[in-house]
Amino acid sequence: MQRMNLVLLLWMTVGVAVAAEPAKIIDVWPGKPPGETTDVGPEVTHPPKDGETPATIRITNIGKPTLSVFLPPKENRNGTSVIICPGGGFNILAWNKEGTEVAEWFNSIGVAAFVLKYRCPTGSRSPNWLAPAQDAQRAVSLVRSRATEFNVDPSRIGLLGFSAGGMAAGAATIKHAQRQYDASDDIDKTSCRPDFAVLVYPAYFVDKQGDLKPEFAIDKTTPPMFFAHAFNDGVTCESSVRLFLELKKAGVPSELHVYSTGGHGFGLRPSSDAASTWPKRCEEWLASRGLLK
């Protein structure tokens, strides 16, 4: 936990919105993403909310998906990488709170991180998760196709998502066998199946009755998953619970943590709630799977 606290100290002591600088930023698509025919205009970064400390950077109007690359020091790299999908209800991306801060923490444990700026807003589309999941699947293929360049193991690439980003990451993972767009180039010849997924308070996987939506059918080929959710989250923890139970039925080794308090949108910023310990539990899970060696 000491490493995480050192990484987060600056964010907890200043009230300005800052985001770590990536080593590089790469385009996810060579041209317009699938299904896009119009220009959404310039991206918009919203000012922090009044009294918000530490501040959160919120980005919207994203029509050109990118990957921001964060690489750990060479002497600490273990070959594992993770693609991070920030949350924001498919309307904004909580860019630093659920993106760049998370990337820096992963770097501190030797994991390369890629923050996905996926298309949004898509909340009014049906299904709202499709475009973000397309971007996530393409991102997996892109990182895997350039594994040598980034010094990562092509068999140790994960997807991580928060809230709506958790749905994007989860949908991309569950539907790995059916690429959610037509392949267009050599990158798309590379597998889009992540080797693991981390879903933190994932949203929208269950219907009004609390049942898992049928389009998210899990089988034995689904990658292992780690879940962290709070019992008192207004975005029901049943999404995590139902997905975990289906993984259990399919024999896919996974891990579920439901904390009594924590609410929604806690990212990995420290608090008095037990939910803020999820990064350590995630680190232990990754280590147990041999992904931090």
Residue ranges: model-predicted function:
Residues 134-220:
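Primarily recognizes the serine-hydrolase "nucleophile elbow" in alpha/beta-hydrolase
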Residues 78-87:
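Short beta-strand element of the alpha/beta-hydrolase
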Residues 20-77:
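N-terminal cap/lid segment of alpha/beta-hydrolase-fold proteins
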Residues 221, 227-229:
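Short beta-strand/loop motif that positions the catalytic acidic residue
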Residues 241-293:
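C-terminal catalytic histidine-bearing segment of alpha/beta-hydrolase fold enzymes
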Residues 93-96, 101-102, 116-151, 269-275:
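Catalytic nucleophile-loop/oxyanion-hole region of alpha/beta-hydrolase
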Residues 86-91, 231:
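Active-site glycine-rich loops that stabilize anionic/oxyanionic intermediates
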Residues 234-241:
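Conserved alpha/beta-hydrolase "acid-adjacent" motif
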